[in-house]
UniProtKB/Swiss-Prot annotation:
It comes from Pectobacterium carotovorum subsp. carotovorum (strain PC1). This is Periplasmic nitrate reductase. Mo-bis(molybdopterin guanine dinucleotide) binds at residues 83, 150, 175, 179, 212-219, 243-247, 262-264, 372, 376, 482, 508-509, 531, 558, 718-727, 802, 819. [4Fe-4S] cluster binds at residues 46, 49, 53, 81. NCBIfam families: NAPA, PRK13532.1, TAT_signal_seq. It catalyses: 2 Fe(II)-[cytochrome] + nitrate + 2 H(+) = 2 Fe(III)-[cytochrome] + nitrite + H2O. PROSITE patterns: 4FE4S_MOW_BIS_MGD, MOLYBDOPTERIN_PROK_1, TAT. Residues 1-31 form the signal peptide. Coiled coil: none annotated. Catalytic subunit of the periplasmic nitrate reductase complex NapAB. Receives electrons from NapB and catalyzes the reduction of nitrate to nitrite.
């Protein structure tokens, strides 16, 4: 194969990106564009993280043969991270599932049987039987679904509609509960609306970046490349990084701070105190646009009610607050002096003061970025609220180059889990099931009888595990996630419920993951561009793609699975007589007829698709299903700050940031001149709140649920690495990525290893109060924990890191704290 100069330059750009991960790109991949005349190219957002990079997908003879960064994509401008360059290979693992598999013995289902191929009809037969039995015997609370921030927008929408409207069960929750729930609740408490007010364009306009619990260099590398360019091109730009251990983002930091776990709360309050004491409050902004409230404290740790920590809490799970004056708030944060904060956090005084001065300087534009370090936190909502406090005190918000920005880890945690509302308490467009008016809006748009949607919040992710274990949740569908590996406290709280003979577990996945192998029925799913899809990224950018290849074997998209399953239920089987009496025309119909084949969702014919355009779902059902569902969903948000563009606009664009009003996207919300919902003369209006004012909360430092003691003498923090994504179910099937980081290791300070007679490369047993795992000692490399803390990634199915973790959650968001538990080490 010969390379032109142009292709040679492209290949070298790819190779340079790969070098960051220590990977050699095969010539065949580097030269993927060489035969571009024979390859068909089309756009799609990347399948991995929440950055939302645009890629060009090359197909040939019904297979994906190449991918490259999309030069017209505003997010990444033609650059991909190393995972993005290997996107084609995630589709073609040797163990790709192509048939439904049921545990069987002697020709029938057996919980202890062997996985046996069956037809889709038989798969849906037994699923329907198990769901109908649970509904009949125990009601809607006995069924549930655990979904995903990786599902497409219409997949999540269809699943939420089936459960909340069809089955009348709010027991549907996404794996975004484990990563973004604290951000959601934090946004809602402070602003009354979810998601960031700024966008990635802030990067090129700011003077300072502050990272709180976010290793962007590895977890959001494309954004990090833009930050790096901004920092190295402008000597006046500053980067501050705060974490419980040193990582690759520290390499660019002007001020890198390692703090004791959980004490970020104290640091945030110290900064607020510094701003007030040094007369750096933006009085004009603060007086006009901010309210103050004192939050309830001692709220527990989201453990089972019988746990001693929950029994001891004065206000378990309370999100109550009361108004307070500025003088009262000033007195509250005054307790967080520099000296006290140094003592609590372990960060040197000069570094803390430099950080506070950065925020306080009225001439400096500042962006705060955070990810799991804030969110996976037993006070994650508080951490989110406290960083908003700093930006609201200084007025550094909703303007180019200024603002707090919660980064997401999954490609559609925003677009699907949050905006669609696949959480157990949410409906589309920030509506909630507990609000009667919101339920009425949903019932009207969905053409349901009044009272169909239950008002009780469903089971969140960790509560689902507990209910399965307790035998109260009996029919359970897990879709597009690997929670048996990714969720907390596996042995004590998850595995028992999955293997309980009272329960029937279904897993939809393209690969035999740990979760799939623990299930009773596995449904093979289409991946990424094997279906038409849409994602929403961290900057409110909604992006579409078309189906580009067919899925292998009998694999079907999650959308097809949800909609097809609805055909198995007559309305009379799931709705009581009082609901049917309101809609007599629905008698004799199925949930498919009512929810997915009604006069709204079927109004776009197949003729809108090009003759040769792949769209397996629409051609199967006989109408443009994705468009019908999207336009129905979009009606929830149009006119009140969640406006989405018409469906067809997204196929033409490289994404649009909502609210999209009169064809124009919004870069910065809540500020005059940028947001169409802010009127002339208002300057700012936080219109999620009735009075248009954001809220500053007084919230204290409170300790972690579990900390080291004499026996379990080390903190354990868990997370990811550059080469692998989440549990590695896709990336570990890419040979190059697997070779680059083949197994998980335990990163430990050299002195901590020496004190335990452990050497680099030796096996080590990590033990918590919940279980133990054997890993390999690593005293060098990219992650450098301080003494007293160890770090372990969770991508390796052979080392089930989450056997160790505690199922403590933020009591307000119900998000798990994967960053803090106590362990001890033993030689193997």
């Amino acid at each position: 194969m010969k390379l032109s100069r142009r292709h040679f330059m492209k290949a070298n750009a790819v190779a340079a990106a790969a070098a960051v991960a220590g990977i050699t790109i095969p010539i065949a991949v580097r030269a993927a564009t060489e035969q571009s005349e024979a390859i068909h190219w089309d756009k799609a957002p990347c399948r991995f993280c929440g950055v939302g990079c645009g890629v060009l997908v090359g197909t040939q003879n019904g297979r994906i043969v190449a991918s490259q960064g999309d030069p017209d994509a505003p997010v990444n401008r033609g650059l991909n991270c190393i995972k993005g360059y290997f996107l084609p290979k995630i589709m073609y693992g040797q163990d790709r599932l192509t048939q439904p598999l049921l545990r069987m013995r002697d020709g029938k289902f057996d919980k202890e049987g062997e996985f046996t191929p069956i037809s889709w009809d038989k798969a849906f037969d037994i699923m329907a039987e198990k769901f109908k039995t649970a509904l009949k015997e125990k009601g809607p609370n006995a069924i549930g679904m655990f979904g995903s921030g990786q599902s497409t927008i219409w997949e999540g929408y269809a699943a939420a509609k089936l459960f909340k409207a069809g089955f009348r069960s709010n027991n549907i929750d996404p794996n975004a509960r484990h990563c973004m729930a604290s951000a959601v609740v934090g946004f809602m408490r402070t602003f009354g609306m979810d998601e960031p007010m700024g966008c990635y364009d802030d990067i090129e306009q700011t003077d300072a970046f502050v990272l709180w619990g976010s290793n962007m260099a590895e977890m959001h590398p494309i954004l990090w490349s833009r930050i790096t360019d901004r920092r190295l091109s402008n000597s006046n730009v500053t980067v501050a990084v705060l974490s419980t251990y040193q990582h690759r983002s520290f390499e660019l930091a002007d001020n890198g701070m390692v703090f004791t776990p959980q004490t970020d709360l104290a640091i945030l309050n110290y900064i607020a105190n510094y701003i007030i004491q040094n007369n750096a409050v933006n009085e004009a902004f603060f007086t006009r646009h901010v309210n103050l409230r004192r939050g309830v404290t001692d709220i527990g740790y989201g453990l089972r009610p019988t746990h001693p920590l929950e029994k001891a809490a004065k206000n378990p799970g309370s999100d109550a607050s009361e108004p307070m004056s500025f003088e009262e708030y000033k007195a509250f944060v005054a307790d967080y002096t520099l000296e006290k904060t140094v003592a609590i956090s372990g960060v040197p005084a000069d570094q803390l003061e430099a950080l506070a001065k950065l925020y306080a300087d009225p001439k400096k534009k500042v962006i705060s970025y955070w990810t799991m370090g804030f969110n996976q936190h037993t006070r994650g909502v508080w951490a989110n609220n406290l960083v908003y406090n700093i930006h609201l005190l200084t007025g550094k918000i909703s303007q180019p180059g200024c603002g707090p920005f919660s980064l997401t880890g999954q490609p559609s945690a925003c677009g699907t889990a949050r905006e669609v509302g696949t959480f157990a308490h949410r409906l589309p467009a920030d509506m909630v099931v507990t609000n009667e008016k919101h339920r009425a809006i949903a019932e009207k748009l969905w053409q349901l009888p009044t009272g169909t949607i239950p008002e009780k919040i469903g089971l969140h992710a960790v509560a689902q595990d507990r209910a399965l274990k307790d035998g109260t949740l009996n029919a359970y569908w897990v879709m597009c996630n690997n929670n048996m590996q990714a969720g907390p406290n596996i042995n004590q709280e998850r595995m028992p419920g999955w293997r309980d003979p009272r329960n029937f577990i279904v897993v939809s996945d393209p690969y035999p993951t740990v979760s799939a192998l623990a299930a009773d029925l596995i449904l093979p799913t289409a991946m990424w561009v094997e279906k038409e899809g849409a994602y929403g990224n961290a900057e409110r950018r909604t992006q579409f793609w078309r189906q580009q290849v067919k899925a292998p074997g009998e694999s079907k998209s999650d959308l097809w699975q949800v909609v097809s399953f609805a055909k198995r239920f007559a309305v009379e089987e799931v709705w009581p007589e009082e609901l049917l009496a309101q809609k007599p025309a629905y008698r004799g119909k199925t949930l498919y007829d009512v929810l997915f084949a009604n006069d709204v969702t079927t109004r776009f014919p197949l003729s809108e698709l090009a003759e040769n355009q792949l769209n397996d779902e629409s051609r199967d059902f006989g109408f443009y299903l994705q468009k019908g569902l999207f336009e129905e969903y979009a009606a929830f948000g149009r006119g009140h700050g969640h406006d989405l563009a018409p469906f067809d606009d997204y196929h033409k664009a490289r994404g649009l940031r909502w609210p999209v009003v009169n064809g124009k996207e919004t870069q910065w919300r809540y500020s005059e001149g940028h947001d169409p919902y802010v009127k002339a003369g208002e300057a700012y209006r936080f219109y999620g709140k009735p009075d248009g004012k954001a809220v500053i909360f007084a919230l204290p430092y409170e300790p972690a649920a579990e900390a080291p003691d004499d026996e379990y003498d080390l903190w354990l923090s868990t997370g990811r690495v550059l080469e692998h994504w989440h549990t590695g179910s896709m990336t570990r099937r890419v040979p190059e990525l697997h070779r680059a980081f083949p197994e998980a290791v335990l990163f430990i300070h050299p002195q901590d290893a020496k004190a335990r007679d452990l050497r680099r490369g030796e096996k080590v047993r990590i033990i918590s109060r919940r279980g133990e795992v054997v890993s390999v000692v690593e005293t060098r490399g990219r992650n450098k924990p301080p003494r007293g803390l160890v770090y372990m990634p969770f991508f390796d199915a052979a080392q089930m890191t989450n056997v160790l973790t505690l199922d403590a959650t933020d009591p307000l968001s119900k998000e798990t704290d994967f960053k803090k538990c106590a362990v001890k080490l033993a030689k193997v």
